[in-house]
């Protein structure tokens, strides 16, 4: 009888868009595994699906593979990093979970695994389907689709990047059968007719990208019944991962499995760590009774779910889609290597972050100062003007006079090849009138005060944003505070019903706008981690009051901020700040104006920033005041534009700035003509000579490297590379002038 059921189940799900499973290529792990380092390789393996000899489906690109059972139910039964033959899965769990009308339902999965420490293939043959779970009925594969439209601003990009990302999407469809509905009714003591559940399907979506060890996953619930349903909550990923360490004693900080997770449901911070407050958790696995931890507290169960709600009403004929997560499977614990893999993933998943315009923060929004800033930008090669905080720029002023004036300024800027926009404060302010967030007792808004985005004020504010940018043609918004994830228990706001749907609805409100901005080519500076929802840039990571310190101290701190911030960001993902005029105090000792009186310091700041490929908010009324100042600014802009591709590339960290000796970073781009650019700074009052081991592995250069000092064609030398894997190095002896710098181009 069991054999008959198994045969029926396999027969029922043996097609992909009508293609028989027998027509799929047979999985050969050894043949499929890609050799070489994906960070350096130009030709990544293509994503595809295969069938194993025992009818398991394999989704692989030669770097990683995820294996699925098809019967007696769908489930992830393998997750491997092929390049070092490492398994990341120890136990089978449901593919997801959804709570509909108060009933928690598993999507797929198998039960009956004898222990949770590891998974043997032969165990799968006797494991069973949960009879109350959604059952796999079909699967299909398509090309990866764009998450939303992106109007590329190629003038700010150093290289063309694809959108959508090349790869494949694999979709599994699950439904509830009559037996499951009977069990659900008994479990939840439901007397009403639950037949409508048969008309609800659960889709589990996966994406795998060509040439990257990255999977994406999300779920979609389709309501084809005649009834309205409520999605109370969900889990879009339940992954029982192999633990990275086992400890008997309880630890304050565990070594998590070597997987970096990203989510497009992320807010309230400038790094991806904030996702642990919004959408991701490494939880304790309560089924893992045989773990080493005495109190069984090893965090080795990856789960993706919103911390509140979403509590969404889904009408007949409509669907609900969860947020997406991405799982980067690492092959190394080396900090630089893991960081590079993460940065490469972000650049691919959010390619608009490679738009890196050279920008100025003009301190006034009236016609004269704005036009002066535009004209100066044209003269020295800057590409964008932002009417900064405190400038008087106001997107909430919808008077015909203001809209007309801003359109004329935008037209003027565009006629000169300059992008123009301004600053708007969203969070950290109180709007009153019952439109602020109402927090539960004992809780406060992230920034002390904040409007609810689903209040009348919030809904109108976003209407104003759409209207303002559509009518003026401005093409940059600096959106301060953004939405930090504040919940709201108000029952009076028109955009949400209460606590449980407040966070989800507010997030949808703001990210729908950000995605619209991407479609229109409107650049977004957002001091929050909204990259995967459309923002271009966030703060590199600095303390604002430091720009009130004496100028000499700012020089070192600036390079420290860049060094530290580029562990988890590319140079184009983070902005810095240059106070041309006083900012939060410090007086004459902190500011650069009058510019002509502080040329050495101004030049050093430009060298710090353009040498790192990092754009800053140069805040003030002007970029230059005399020809000598103009020449210095133009020199560094020209340097950046000449070497834009390599300077926009990833940074390898050599020596952190400490003011006591040299500091250095190495830009790398193995696909470029200039494969490396070494920037070295000397903060000391004396010239120094140093011998530096340059880590050239990430340049992709083998054998020997040609090194050119600055732009001097007569100073080219060939240096033998000492081969040592990730530690491949070329030894370089260099002279660095006092309070100066030098740079070297590697080919």
Q: What is each residue range found by the language model?
A:
Residues 356-362, 385-387, 420-424, 477-479, ...:
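Hydrophobic faces of well-ordered beta-strands that scaffold small-molecule active sites
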Residues 59-62, 510-716, 731-733:
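Active-site-proximal substrate-binding groove within the catalytic cores of carbohydrate-active enzymes
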């Amino acid at each position: 009888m069991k054999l008959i059921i198994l045969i029926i189940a396999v027969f029922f799900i043996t097609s992909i868009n009508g293609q028989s499973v027998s027509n799929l290529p047979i999985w050969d792990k050894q043949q499929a595994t890609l050799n070489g380092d994906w960070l350096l390789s130009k030709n990544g393996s293509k994503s595809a699906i295969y069938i194993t000899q025992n009818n398991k489906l394999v989704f692989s690109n030669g770097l990683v593979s995820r294996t699925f059972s098809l019967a007696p139910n769908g489930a992830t039964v393998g997750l491997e990093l092929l390049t070092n033959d490492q398994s990341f899965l120890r136990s089978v769990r449901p593919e997801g979970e959804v709570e509909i009308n108060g009933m928690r339902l598993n999507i797929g999965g198998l039960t009956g695994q004898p222990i949770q420490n590891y998974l043997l293939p032969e165990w799968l043959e006797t494991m069973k389907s949960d009879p109350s779970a959604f059952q796999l009925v079909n699967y299909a594969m398509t090309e990866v689709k764009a998450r939303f439209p992106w109007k590329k601003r190629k003038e700010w990009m150093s290289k063309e990047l694809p959108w959508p990302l090349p790869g494949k999407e694999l979709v599994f469809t699950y439904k509830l059968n009559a037996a499951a509905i009977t069990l659900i009714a008994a479990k939840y003591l439901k007397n009403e007719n639950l037949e409508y559940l048969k008309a609800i399907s659960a889709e589990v979506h996966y994406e795998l990208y060509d040439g990257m060890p990255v999977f994406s996953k999300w779920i979609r619930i389709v309501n084809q019944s005649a009834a309205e349903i409520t999605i109370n909550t969900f889990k879009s990923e339940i992954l029982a991962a192999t633990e990275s360490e086992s400890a008997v004693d309880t630890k304050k900080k565990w070594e998590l499995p070597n997987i970096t997770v990203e989510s497009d449901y992320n807010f309230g911070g400038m790094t991806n760590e904030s996702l642990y407050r919004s959408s991701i958790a490494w939880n304790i696995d309560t089924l893992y009774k045989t773990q080493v931890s005495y109190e069984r507290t090893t965090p080795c169960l990856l789960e993706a779910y919103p911390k509140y709600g979403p509590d969404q009403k889904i009408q007949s004929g409509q669907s609900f889609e969860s947020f997406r997560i991405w799982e980067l499977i690492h092959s190394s614990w080396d900090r630089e290597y893991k960081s590079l893999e993460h940065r490469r993933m972000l650049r691919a998943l959010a390619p608009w972050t490679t738009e890196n315009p050279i920008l100025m923060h003009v301190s006034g929004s009236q016609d004269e100062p704005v036009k002066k800033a535009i004209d100066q930008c044209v003269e020295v090669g800057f590409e964008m003007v932002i009417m900064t905080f405190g400038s008087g720029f106001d997107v909430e002023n919808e008077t015909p006079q203001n809209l007309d004036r801003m359109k004329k300024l935008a037209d003027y800027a565009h006629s000169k090849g300059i992008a123009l926009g301004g600053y708007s404060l969203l969070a950290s302010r109180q709007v009153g009138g019952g439109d602020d967030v109402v927090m539960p007792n004992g809780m406060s808004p992230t920034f002390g005060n904040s409007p609810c985005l689903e209040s009348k004020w919030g809904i109108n504010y976003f209407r104003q944003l759409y209207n303002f940018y559509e009518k003026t043609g401005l093409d940059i918004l600096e959106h301060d505070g953004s939405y930090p994830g504040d919940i709201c228990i108000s029952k009076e706001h028109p955009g949400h019903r209460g606590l449980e749907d407040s966070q989800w609805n507010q997030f949808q409100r703001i990210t729908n706008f950000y995605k619209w901005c991407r479609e229109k080519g409107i650049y977004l500076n957002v001091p929050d981690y909204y990259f995967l929802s459309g923002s271009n840039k966030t703060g590199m990571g600095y303390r604002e009051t430091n720009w009130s310190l004496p100028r000499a101290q700012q020089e070192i701190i600036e390079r420290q901020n860049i060094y530290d911030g580029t562990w988890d960001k590319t140079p184009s993902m983070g902005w810095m700040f240059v106070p041309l005029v006083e900012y939060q105090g410090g007086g004459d000792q902190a500011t650069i104006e009058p510019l002509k009186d502080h040329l050495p310091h101004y030049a050093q700041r430009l060298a710090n920033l353009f040498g790192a490929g990092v754009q800053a908010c140069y805040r003030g009324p002007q970029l230059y005041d005399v020809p000598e100042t103009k020449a210095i600014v133009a020199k560094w802009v020209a340097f950046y534009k000449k070497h834009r591709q390599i300077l926009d590339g990833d940074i390898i960290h050599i020596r952190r700035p400490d003011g006591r000796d040299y500091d250095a970073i190495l830009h790398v781009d193995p696909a470029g003509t200039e494969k490396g650019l070494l920037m070295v700074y000397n903060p000391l009052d004396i010239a120094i000579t140093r011998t530096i081991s340059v880590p050239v592995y990430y340049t992709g250069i083998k054998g020997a490297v040609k090194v050119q000092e600055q732009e001097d064609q007569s100073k080219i030398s060939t240096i033998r590379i000492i081969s040592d894997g990730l530690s491949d190095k070329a030894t370089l002896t260099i002279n660095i002038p006092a309070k100066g710098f030098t740079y070297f181009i590697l080919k």
